[in-house]
């Protein structure tokens, strides 16, 4: 289980901590932020990209496959639901769409290439985003 604490004192800079590491998020100048850190969508995409790279590395280590490097690039955008060719259910309005480009470097045979392509979608963050999330929210005031 992962745990993150976020604190905003003023402006748009949010200080984040998991108890061992600290980092921050912000909005770009055009959204009235100070651009001192990645925005929330960039943090989401960085989680997905890191998970993809780590999942591939751990799989290769487990199978004894030599992996030279992985570069994962993700973009998020909103598209009209009617333009979504991958969507199972018809939806109205806009949907969020994540596009990826994953470059896996190494000397792989055809079977390994096929399997590594499948492993990309097996990263836990990808699975979470694909199947949806149940939220339990508790808001308090003082």
Regions found by a protein language model. Give the residues of each.
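Alpha-helical metal-binding/catalytic segments enriched in His/Glu/Asp
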Residues: 48-52
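Extended beta-strand/beta-hairpin segments
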Residues: 1-46, 57-142
